[in-house]
Design a protein with these regions (language model features):
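Residues within the DNA-recognition helix of helix-turn-helix
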Residues: 56
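Short, positively charged, low-complexity/disordered linker segments
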Residues: 68-69, 73, 112-114
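Amphipathic alpha-helical dimerization/coiled-coil segments
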Residues: 1-12, 84-114
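Beta-hairpin "wing" of winged helix-turn-helix
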Residues: 61-71, 78
Length: 114
């Protein structure tokens, strides 16, 4: 059964899922839920240039999913969203337990044109 809250907030939910639906942003947020990280450390973990990373971080900041802290020239990011934490728990429950081979799911999605 679909809740009336979800119906009322469908546009916001879709925007949130669109931002979180990007592989790199999903990885960024996964790392940030473990604690604060510098821009350089995030870039290294997700294998992005700092310029590419800054574009992803801008989208996450736009939805207030991350918060920043500056220490001299270093900028540190952390997760600022309980919704992100909950989403990652759900995704880990679906994909983290080996319920389905992710490579097979990805192949099916590509065949379906998604």
């Amino acid at each position: 059964m679909v809740s009336t809250k979800l119906i009322a907030n469908a546009e916001s939910a879709a925007e949130f899922l669109m931002v979180m639906g990007n592989e790199k942003r999903l990885l960024i947020m996964s790392y940030l839920t473990d604690g604060e990280m510098s821009v350089g450390a995030i870039a290294e973990k997700v294998m992005l240039s700092q310029s590419a990373l800054s574009q992803h971080l801008a989208k996450l900041r736009a939805l207030d999913l991350v918060e920043t802290r500056r220490d001299r020239q270093m900028i540190y990011y952390s997760c600022n969203s309980d919704a992100v934490r909950e989403l990652l728990v759900v995704l880990d429950g679906i994909f983290g337990g080996g319920k389905e081979d992710l490579s097979q799911m990805a192949q099916r999605l590509r065949r379906a044109g998604t």
